[in-house]
């Protein structure tokens, strides 16, 4: 069984700390975009372990419920694999996906990468029906 370690302790191309995407011409790591979108009740980026009240959509600056963060995180990985289809193909050569940091937060990069490998188009279509994506499109 081939296992892909999806963290900074494994193949860094599959780590949210190293995988980079552009939003409105600004390139940052997936982790940076994700953390920057989180806000506390005062609209500030919350400190580590602090409660997230809502998110700010970096595509348009709109305030969205914190529940949209998972779809945003998935969207970031979809953007990454859309610009790096060779990495998605490479990941298809693995049977399992692990993240040694799994369980420390609600979103797990290994789970998202596994979902992308299993059904990239289906996952992309699911995100396109989400509240987060509809907000991006102004609907």
Region annotations inferred by a language model:
Residues 1-35:
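N-terminal accessory segments that precede or flank the first globular/catalytic domain
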Residues 39-101, 116-136:
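Long, contiguous internal "core" modules enriched in hydrophobic/ aromatic residues
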Residues 102-116:
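Active-site nucleophilic cysteine motif
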């Amino acid at each position: 069984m081939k296992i892909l370690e999806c963290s900074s302790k494994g193949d860094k191309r599959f780590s949210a700390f190293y995988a980079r995407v552009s939003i409105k011409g600004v390139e940052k790591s997936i982790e940076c975009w994700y953390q920057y979108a989180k806000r506390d009740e005062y609209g500030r980026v919350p400190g580590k372990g602090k409660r997230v009240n809502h998110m700010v959509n970096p595509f348009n600056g709109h305030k969205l419920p914190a529940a949209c963060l998972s779809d945003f995180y998935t969207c970031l990985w979809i953007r990454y694999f859309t610009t790096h289809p060779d990495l998605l193909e490479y990941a298809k050569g693995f049977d399992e996906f692990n993240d040694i940091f799994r369980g420390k937060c609600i979103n797990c990069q290994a789970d998202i990468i596994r979902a992308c490998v299993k059904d990239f188009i289906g996952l992309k279509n699911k995100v396109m029906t989400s509240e987060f994506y509809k907000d991006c499109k102004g609907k």
